[in-house]
């Protein structure tokens, strides 16, 4: 097998209403593919045969980590097959454990699958500094945040906003259920 034949890139097919990625040669314009191929620098912290984890060069907190499959896959997590998603989540879980154990004051790590910065499937891990006091679950609230987003602004936020109206929530639930 040639080196290029061993690299992968998604080609979409439709299966059960979902776009499922199939394999074809790597995207040479993809920064993550270039990192995998050691053609671009990165601060690697973990890898196995199929996945790679490296520190984000644009962290919003110390230790933000990107976990990727080494094979190029579409960036929208739900466009990928179950095997690919589950394998990535297992890799992310392994790396999150490393962050929890090795970063002072980190007891939990958050994960998102945003997929807009680079068109290559990836999980972003966010060490939650200040959660590593050794105790079991404790509630941490995001009080005083009333920012509501009508549309995506380039980042995700998990803060609570103002209490939503139950009639509006019921209408939204019916819409999502297709009623």
PLM features: residue spans?
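HIT superfamily nucleotide-processing domains
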Residues: 2-179
């Amino acid at each position: 097998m040639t080196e290029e034949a061993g690299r992968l890139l998604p080609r979409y097919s439709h299966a059960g209403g979902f776009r499922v990625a199939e394999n074809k040669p790597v995207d040479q314009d993809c920064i993550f593919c270039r990192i995998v191929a050691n053609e671009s620098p990165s601060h690697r912290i973990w890898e196995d045969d199929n996945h790679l984890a490296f520190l984000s060069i644009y962290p919003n907190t110390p230790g933000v980590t990107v976990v990727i499959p080494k094979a190029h896959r579409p960036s929208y997590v739900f466009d990928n097959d179950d095997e690919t998603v589950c394998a990535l989540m297992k890799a992310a879980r392994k790396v999150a454990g490393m962050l929890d154990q090795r970063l002072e004051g980190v007891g939990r790590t958050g994960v998102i699958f945003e997929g807009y910065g680079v068109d290559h499937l990836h999980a972003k891990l966010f060490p939650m500094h200040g959660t590593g006091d050794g105790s079991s679950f404790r509630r941490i609230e995001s009080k005083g945040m009333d920012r509501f987003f009508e549309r995506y602004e380039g980042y995700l936020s998990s803060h609570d906003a103002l209490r939503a109206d139950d009639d509006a929530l019921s209408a939204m639930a019916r819409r999502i259920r297709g009623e």
